[in-house]
Amino acid sequence: MLRAVAALVINIINIYCVKGYSMKKIRIFLAFVLTVSLFTATACTSQTGESSSAADSQSVSQSQENSGSSSESEADSSQTAKPVTDYTTYVSNTVISTGNNFCIEEVENITYRAYLPVEEYGEFEYKFFFTNTVDSTYSKGKIAYVGKSGGSYTVSNATVADGGTGVEDEITNRTPVTFGGETKKDVKPDESYTSDTVTINIPEGHYLVWEWTVSGKGIPCTKMSTLTSTTSSSDGTQFNYCDEIPLPQLIGAKRNVKHTLAAIGDSITQGCQTEFMKYEFWASKISTQLGSDVAFFNCGLGWARASDAVANESWLSRVSEYDTVIVAFGTNDIVSGKYWGKKSTAEEIEGYLDTIVSYLTEKGCDVILFNAPPQDFKETNEGIRTALNEKIPAIAEKYEAKFFDFSALLSTEAEPEKAVYGGHPNGEGGTVVADAFVKQFGSMFE
């Protein structure tokens, strides 16, 4: 079809030029020919059932510039059906965030093990999703920064298992995880891949244990900050605590849920520095209160900035597969700023958040936008936070998103800068936030 159109266009140009027609008339006639051709091609495509999609853009900004579609006035998840993809079929079954915000320099046949609390117990078909790229910047970006390519590495063995009720219990029901029918997988830089499906039963109160052996350089990983039990072993028998562990970016289970909820943010969303294996951070408590009918996908990462989410569409696109998305950034944009830049101004952070919310609403998500929490900042940074928080409700209003006053819950009216429950809110703060969130938005998930 395209060759025929091209040949026709060339012939028209030759004929009209010979006859002395003006370029204006030639352009008008060509526009007519191309319009008819495109209409015909579209009709043929719809009849044969074939479709095509545009390649993913390198950033959210590029994606929005290339998009010709406009968002609805309000993304109502009860009315807007998400396209069926692997991400909507295999939904998150743990509140533990397993994205990439760090890199392991080099390892040889190291076995990593993680205990993952599940949102819904029972027997499910699982699929595991991976990206060999860093999602967000860690600290000043010396070791890991947004978009950094992972190195080549090899998976020699992977399993999931029933971890019992804790690390002291025997690990049982070890089930192999394969990749294209093979136990071994060679991974290229920036490669995204999935496992084959695997079925396993996790009884009430038990952990899902992920374990795999990898070798390679520059492997993207998660820094857990004592969130759950993560260990490594050089011989597969003696496991020792490790805080940097490569994991699937989504622990996906094929389960029937009424609603899907994702959260993208920093270490406060991830739950860092809360009590070990108690899962008292606010995201976990929201998931518990909403129940297993709501799949909760935690994409919070330590040190993450809003500017990271704008720069890395892969990270942001993961949460865009979910019905509702919590957006909770600000702290690290104020403290550290954009990777390789200086600390961001309130206006710059406002711009990043605007881009994120715009992107998600265009994808059909309900967005719940948090403001920046108190951090006991001194005058300069507190001034940025105050100015930013004054701007955030307007962003929510602009896109008919929901606004959540995160800051007010974690401070007092007399001392709004003071972090009452700590810079990383403790279990008590987690309860305060979860209670208020469910009271305000619970009806969305019924």
Residue spans for each PLM region:
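N-terminal secretory targeting modules
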Residues: 12-15, 20-22, 44-264, 269-270, ...
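Sec-dependent N-terminal signal peptides of Gram-positive bacterial secreted proteins and lipoproteins
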Residues: 26-46
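Conserved SGNH/GDSL esterase-like catalytic core that processes O-acyl groups on lipids
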Residues: 258-263, 268-354, 376-378, 386, ...
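Surface-exposed amphipathic alpha-helices with a cationic face
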Residues: 354-364, 393
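A short helix->loop->beta-strand "cap" motif at the edges of active sites that frequently abuts
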Residues: 363-366, 401
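Catalytic His-Asp segment of secreted/periplasmic serine-dependent ester chemistry enzymes
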Residues: 373-446
